């Protein structure tokens, strides 16, 4: 209440002083930045070790309460702290924002003023001023003649006014740290934007089927309200097998449908995804959806299959095939893969034979006692289903741009920012310089400059001595 009783101008002035003299120095503190960076590293490692975006049942199975991992890490701890989606938790995003604020404050209070000072130039007008420079010398009876040309040949930008000279090079080295900070801010902004507006989903689509993006495994708050409205059609799914039966590659012929119209079509495979409007579709899984069969002269009908596990852990797909109109009797059909070979068993588990896609099996000939009447099964088609992992991360362009600028900024930061001053007096020439890195290299450069200046001065005296002689 006291604040609002103050005049508005005084309140704004107090707020500015607090921001400039208290908040900015606190945010720009190197210790705070290092602490936040370590916290981000630890939390990122936690998100790498603990599986992300899994179901509660998964964490209950892998992180039981007894015994607890490391004595404390249980599924309850993981779910309550949000460790199952670390990168989307409010506290992780808050740490990223705080770290970004620290970088921005450091740039405003340190890097930007350093760049502004580096762009200015000032002359040293007194010989005593050269005593503060780490590299300095005095050349009796010499002048500035020829020195600007030598400095320009070495890449310096030279400023001269009368008997005063100032030269600098490597200003890009002062820009580099600022570019590094800007690039890191871009990376942070991209990560934050991706966390709140990106999503991950999984869809299992049978061949010929159409599906929308709806089975989310992880999504930011903005993404849930703005999911893509276009649909995915799986025109065909197939598997290439090697001669020994091993899987060579998985393929899905996909179409993107926008308001019923096909806007893009592409065949994807493992490591070769489809991208559309910032959404990427990866080939991630597969299954068998159903079978199309005929019995004797009946029309073709479609029967769904369900996945089953054997005692050895092998995955099969099974379906009940009725042999009577009232479905009182039937056979169990098992499919081990998409190669089109089905195994038939009776209700007692006795093997009745195998049936290949596009072929038929006369059961009355295989088991005449069990099937006295003519009974022929036709397996017309085994319908596979493609498992797609769908990802959208709108922050990726900013992250990529940030990493690109980061590499450029790091290289720029290695350029030395070097300065040289010179003062001509009645008795001689004062010369001095300094640099922010590569001191040995600059020392050699400075010594070479001094020697060149001495040689130039000596050569300038030869014609004069000849005339005197």
Swiss-Prot record:
Belongs to the Ccs1/CcsB family. This is Cytochrome c biogenesis protein CcsB. Keywords: Cytochrome c-type biogenesis, Membrane, Thylakoid, Transmembrane, Transmembrane helix. The chain crosses the membrane at residues 30-50, 89-109, 175-195. Pfam families: ResB (PF05140). It comes from Synechococcus sp. (strain JA-2-3B'a(2-13)). The lineage of its organism: Bacteria, Bacillati, Cyanobacteriota, Cyanophyceae, Synechococcales. It is found in: Cellular thylakoid membrane. The keyword Cell inner membrane does not apply. May interact with CcsA. Required during biogenesis of c-type cytochromes (cytochrome c6 and cytochrome f) at the step of heme attachment. GO terms for cellular component: plasma membrane-derived thylakoid membrane. InterPro entries: Cyt_c_bgen_Ccs1/CcsB/ResB, ResB-like_domain. It is a multi-pass membrane protein. GO terms for biological process: cytochrome complex assembly.
